[in-house]
Amino acid sequence: MYPVNLKLSIKFLFYFFLYFLLIIIIYGVYLYFKINQVIHGKIWKFPISIYSRIVTLEPGNNYSKKDIIAILKSNRYKQVNFLTMPGEFLVKRNSLILIRRSFNFPEGFEDKISIKLLFDKNKLVRIVHLSNNRNFSILRLDPQLIAMIYSPKGEKRLFVSQKNYPKALIQTLLTIEDKCFYNHYGINFYSMFRAFFVNLISGHSIQGGSTLTQQLVKNLFLTNIRSLWRKINEIYMALILDFQYSKEKILELYLNEVYLGQDKNEQIRGFALASLYYFGRPINELRLDECALLVGMVKGASLYNPWNNPVLTLNRRNLVLYVLFKHKVINRTLYEKLKSKPLNIQSRGNIIWFRSAFVQIVEKEFQKKVGYYFQNFSGIKIFTTLDLISQIAAENAIRHGIQQLKKKYKLQDLEASMVIIDRFSGEIRGVLGSSNPNLLGYNRAIQAKRSIGSLSKPITYLAALSQPEYFRLNTWIPDTPIKIKMQNGKLWKPQNNNFEFVGKVMLIDALKNSMNVPIVHLSMKLGLKKIVQTWIQLGLSSNHIFKYPSIALGSINLTSMEVAKIFQVISSGGNKANIISIRSVLSENNKLIYHSFPQSKQVISAQASYLTLYAMQSVVSSGTAKHLGKFFKNMHLAGKTGTTNNLVDSWFVGIDGRQVVIVWIGRDNNKTTKCYGSTGAMKIYHNYLKLNNPKPLLLIPPRDVYFLNINKSGDFMCFRSYSKYFRAIPVWIRNHNIFCT
């Protein structure tokens, strides 16, 4: 017989054990449902991903081999000697061969594909599918991720399924972090006890014993506060997670959840996004040494940051490679080869994460077209009109140009904005709202209304040339002193820049030399009503326009974007296009939410637009922008300089065969820039063209426009004898013989 006290003790322990077991079971059920709710629900809320434009190649289109190489490089394709994986291309004499990446386009998913692009006289003539030698009529190139915004909980990530991760990355990860991943049940007791004793002997934590499953539990379900209770929860939840889900599912979650760095105040989560962040390429295109770098960062992404601590990171990567060698994952030859490689990360400045000015425009358009704020969505993909080549060229042109001007004029507060749009479709190809491309806040491209100066002159000439029975390019305009009584009773006496008068000047020469007095005479003859009507036809709201004679000289305040809209119409034969930044929007599950279609409307006669644009070409060839014309002789560029009183604003509008570009330079305090349009804004445009090769602006005369010879006096000369004073000008007439009677 046992003593009574002993029986009671055994009974007490028995019931205590039962209650304890019951509590563990109940708590386990609670954890089970908690895990289940997260895993089977929406594990993550994703940020909004914004992509550059999707370039579509077609035989016969305007892309040269050089253009396509530039596009591929801007989309982070790698030029190689031998093709091995998607995202690579090689160059041959009259062809390009590439492996186009798989991508979920708005029109649907397209798998990776090997393509040969054939050129004749530097023009794309054939697109050949290499696997079956079939011709393609079109080829879409995958776009570049340019921004991720509205990151829930301050976490950025791109979800990639486990099957799309390279085997080299997974093998490296398991070798370094959890060799027994496929053999344990969520926890590895041997590793835990080993780490416990190592840390106990050293007196501080130097080794971890957590499995990938435990690390995942910590990231998904637990706080960062270290405690015994957290460790108990971690072990229990790891066992439940391992019991409930397959190893592949757990691995997939880990690959997309692990912390791998910081982008300002937002966390970089998952290997897929880290690959873009550090290397600028998708995860499936990384080499083994690059995979080793990312796996090495798992131990401490801040400590092993390749930008902040490159030497430490290199040593850590090489240690990972050494472990792979010791475990016979790689041989000595490969180990020696890989450890000698540099880190190969992209420079921090090349991370295209946030084009703030452009993203502001995208957000505004999204709200207008879709009817909701960005914050209401998770994981949507927005495909924009942004051309990376143009945008990066603009950023570099502004950055270097403003730096030179600041130094030259000793003005440290010079600011700038730049707008680039497609002259036909109206799609925005690039935007800068500041001299610092990545500066958040005030977007001068769409918020800063500034006096446009002489940029208004082409609109007055357009109004005149719309009346061919009264005005032609060879029409003489007075250049004599003029006094105009203003509404306040004061007399306005406009002057030319050189304070001289020549008596009279032909319309085309008045425009190309940006003369002030002739255009005032012209505007008085036209009437302010006609000029205002032309501005409104071009798309400007009547609220912007004050009916004063000085409107002819630019006493009108507009943003760079509003100026771009005006000159888009003139550059496209009088067709007003919708200025857009968004092509398509996909939902989180890749359903099409929104798609834009190019639309335009004829608002100005094609003939008057042609004549105005032709005159603007003379500005570049022999007028106020002739220095630009010297560098781009065969491009037939059109342009117009703009300068406001006291050199407060410096403007330039440049037009080539594909783009309208507006550049503004000024100071936020409205003090002088010391720059004319030709010495400030035009210099920026010049830099831009050097970085982004222009296309020739080849104008085709519309119906009823003919080229006729005129002499020095502006008279039409119908005989064919040669004279150095002859020049041909386009004339809008229905019967050209009328001038030769």
Curated annotation (Swiss-Prot):
Pathway it works in: Cell wall biogenesis; peptidoglycan biosynthesis
Q: Output this protein's name.
A: Penicillin-binding protein 1B
Q: Which UniProt keywords apply?
A: Antibiotic resistance, Carboxypeptidase, Cell membrane, Cell shape, Cell wall biogenesis/degradation, Glycosyltransferase, Hydrolase, Membrane, Multifunctional enzyme, Peptidoglycan synthesis, Protease, Signal-anchor, Transferase, Transmembrane, Transmembrane helix
What PANTHER family is this protein classified in?
BINDING PROTEIN TRANSPEPTIDASE, PUTATIVE-RELATED (PTHR32282), PENICILLIN-BINDING PROTEIN 1B (PTHR32282:SF11)
Region of interest called Transpeptidase, as start-end residue ranges on this chain: 395-687
The record lists the catalysed reaction(s) as: [GlcNAc-(1->4)-Mur2Ac(oyl-L-Ala-gamma-D-Glu-L-Lys-D-Ala-D-Ala)](n)-di-trans,octa-cis-undecaprenyl diphosphate + beta-D-GlcNAc-(1->4)-Mur2Ac(oyl-L-Ala-gamma-D-Glu-L-Lys-D-Ala-D-Ala)-di-trans,octa-cis-undecaprenyl diphosphate = [GlcNAc-(1->4)-Mur2Ac(oyl-L-Ala-gamma-D-Glu-L-Lys-D-Ala-D-Ala)](n+1)-di-trans,octa-cis-undecaprenyl diphosphate + di-trans,octa-cis-undecaprenyl diphosphate + H(+); Preferential cleavage: (Ac)2-L-Lys-D-Ala-|-D-Ala. Also transpeptidation of peptidyl-alanyl moieties that are N-acyl substituents of D-alanine
The record places the following residue ranges in the Extracellular compartment, namely 34-741
- For this protein, the Enzyme Commission number is 2.4.99.28, 3.4.16.4
Q: What Pfam families would the database entry show?
A: Transgly, Transpeptidase, UB2H
Q: Which residues cross the membrane?
A: 13-33
Question: According to Swiss-Prot or TrEMBL, what is its membrane topology?
Answer: Single-pass type II membrane protein
Task: Report if keyword ATP-binding is assigned.
Answer: no
Principal subcellular localization:
membrane
Stated role: Cell wall formation. Synthesis of cross-linked peptidoglycan from the lipid intermediates. The enzyme has a penicillin-insensitive transglycosylase N-terminal domain (formation of linear glycan strands) and a penicillin-sensitive transpeptidase C-terminal domain (cross-linking of the peptide subunits).
Query: Where is the protein found, in the record's own terms?
Result: Cell membrane
Q: What's a GO biological-process term for it? A: proteolysis
Q: Topological domain, Cytoplasmic: which ranges?
A: 1-12
Q: Which SUPFAM superfamilies match?
A: beta-lactamase/transpeptidase-like, Lysozyme-like
